[in-house]
Amino acid sequence: MKVLVVGSGGREHAICWKLSKSPKVDKIYCAPGNAGIAELAECVDIKAMEFEKLVAFAKENSIDLTVIGMDDPLVGGVVDVFEAERLRVFGPRKNAAILEGSKAFSKDLMKKYNIPTAAYETFTSAKEAKKYLETAEYPIVLKADGLALGKGVLICENKEDALAGVDELMLDKKFGTAGDTIVIEEFMTGREVSVLSFVDGNTIKIMSSAQDHKRAKDGDQGLNTGGMGNFSPSPFYTKEVDEFCKKYIYQATVDAMKSEGRPFKGVIFFGLMLTPKGPKVLEYNARFGDPEAQVVLPRMKNDIVDVFEACIDGTLDKVDLQFEDNACVCVILASDGYPLAYEKGFEIKGMENFKGKDDYFLFHAGSKFNEEGKVVTNGGRVLGVTALGKDLKEARAKAYEATEWVDFDNKYMRHDIGLSLIH
C-alpha cells in the first residue's frame, strides 16, 4: 500500500520509520518532510496547511492511507477534507481535534464530565482577567486558548507577572488569535507524565508513558520549549496511577467526546500531573507528541498500519497493543539560542555513523538540503538522538554516547535528560 504522512518534524520522521517497518507498506510519501525523512520517503513540496493540494496529491497517486502528524492541520479540519473525498485518513476530525485546539473547550469538557483537572476560569476580556488576578492565589497558570507551538503557557509567581502575562497573551497578541481567550488555572505541583493512546471513537488503548523535559537549560532552567528530550517509560507512571487513570480519565474522555457528538479517532496524548491528591489532566493533544513519538514508537511491537486502520474502522478492541519491556531515551540537539533567536543553515556532519546500528536512531526535526545538496540545520530543534536499552540507565548512556557522533556549528543540548532517575 501507499502511505502519505503530513508534517516535517522529528515526530513525522519517527512515524515514517515505523511505517517503513510494515510489510504492508510499499511506498511512503511525506509532505513536506525533511532531509532525514527523505531517506525513508519521497518528500513532496506541499505544506501541511495546503489541504486541497494534499487531497489532489492523494487522489493522483492512489494513496491508500494518509497519516496527519501535526496539530495545525488537524485543528484546521484536514481530516474532514480528506473524508469528504472518500480518502482513508488517520486523525481526528475538526470537531474532535478541538480537544487540543481550544483549552477552554477541554477544561469545560473535563468539568462537565468530572474528569480530574486543575480549578480554572476562562476569560475573553483582559480587563476581567486582571480583575480576577487581584484576589487570586499565587503561583498561578495562564494559558492561551488556541495553538501556540506548545509555548502558550505562562507560570506566574506573583500578581505583577500575571498581569504582564495577560498583556502578553491578550493585548500584545504574542501568539496571535490563540490569546483571544485565555484560561487561568490553579498551579498544580507534582510530576508531569505524558501518556499516548490510540482511540477509535469508542475504544481506547494506551501505548506507553513518557517523560518530557520542556525547559531549554539543564536543571529545568530557562524558557519553555517544544521539548528538549524525553524518555519512555516513565517510572512515575506506576500500576496505581495507571489503574486510576483507566478508571477516571482515559475512557471517560473518549466517552465524553462521544456524548458531545464529537467522536474522537486518532491519537490522544494525555498530559498528566501526578499531584499529592492523585493524577489530574494538565492538557490534551490530538496527535503524537514530539519528541514523545520518538521514544514510544521504537518500543512498539505491533505493525502500526494495523493499528491506524483499526482506529479508522472502529475495530481497535480487536488489537492487542504490545510494547517491548525496555526503555528509550531521546536527546534533542538544538540550535544554540532556541527557543529565541538562532542561526540556521549549518552543515550537519556524522549522520552516517547511525547506519546499521540497531538500537540507535537519528530522527530529524529541523533539517533540509541546501543548494549544493548538503544536509543543513533548518530549525530550533534539529535532531533527536535516540537509543533503546534494557533499562533507562543503558538507554540514556547510549543516547548521550551517540550525541557525539553527529555535529553542526551551533549544536546545543541538555545534559540531564533522565539523569534524576539514575542516581
Roles of regions detected by a PLM:
Residues L4-V5, E100-T181, Q211, P235, ...:
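Active-site nucleotide/adenylate-binding loops and adjacent lid/helix of ATP-dependent enzymes
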Residues S367-E372, V376-H423:
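Generic C-terminus detector
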Residues A38-L40, K53-V55, I98-A104, K217-D218:
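Short, charged, surface-exposed secondary-structure boundary motifs
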Residues K21, G36-A38, E60, F90, ...:
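Solvent-exposed alpha-helices and their adjacent loops that cap or buttress functional pockets
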Residues K246-I268, N285-K357, N370:
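Active-site "cap" helix and flanking loop/linker of ATP-utilizing ligase/carboxylase catalytic domains
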